[in-house]
């Protein structure tokens, strides 16, 4: 009788020990834990996607400096390019603001040819030479600093002239000092002070070549280009009618 009781007690204890455990006590790596991990990963991935979509719809505001440099649409120029520059012309100027026409006006910053990393302050040109009382030019001319986008090079080809450049984290414009006739069309009276009974005369704008920074494909390079530099009088002797 006692043996039967012991057998029943042992069978009861074995049955309790073999009963399945709850999900709260499932060891790592079990199917229940894997389902929970997959669910957590899916929720995390969905949260990351939502965050990325929100960032794309509402991008972070850019700094004012970045917006200013981006809107300039300029080309970054290697400082070594200026060290290779030769035949510097006083009619070409790299400046952060429009330069003055007279030395008496406010000076501006520009890149110097000898040391482009050192910006000097000076004015380049005068608007017109000073004449003594009673002196007049045979042709009226006008001078101004201009920005060119295209020009003709020394080989007669049309080239693209760089207007804005990014040099040492500052935006500079390339200015050209041009002089041309005030009246683009010749006047019947001819040049001032020329005897119209003996000479045919007219005023015309002449050009010369200066070294300018241009675009060659996707690279910046120095080229000789033509710009207006003077207004001169052209004369020819009238033929006598017999």
From Swiss-Prot:
Molecular function terms from GO: growth factor activity; lipid binding; nerve growth factor receptor binding; peptidase inhibitor activity; toxin activity
Q: Which GO terms describe its cellular component?
A: axon; dendrite; extracellular space; synaptic vesicle
Arranged from A to Z, the UniProt key words for this protein are: Cleavage on pair of basic residues, Disulfide bond, Glycoprotein, Growth factor, Lipid-binding, Metalloenzyme inhibitor, Metalloprotease inhibitor, Protease inhibitor, Secreted, Signal, Toxin
Q: Which Pfam families match?
A: NGF (PF00243)
List the signal peptide residues. 1-18
Query: Which parts of the sequence are annotated with region: Disordered?
Result: 47-70
Q: Which residues are glycosylated?
A: 166
Q: Tell me where it resides.
A: Secreted
> What does the function comment of this entry state?
Nerve growth factor is important for the development and maintenance of the sympathetic and sensory nervous systems. It stimulates division and differentiation of sympathetic and embryonic sensory neurons as well as basal forebrain cholinergic neurons in the brain. Its relevance in the snake venom is not clear. However, it has been shown to inhibit metalloproteinase-dependent proteolysis of platelet glycoprotein Ib alpha, suggesting a metalloproteinase inhibition to prevent metalloprotease autodigestion and/or protection against prey proteases.
Q: Identify this protein by name.
A: Venom nerve growth factor
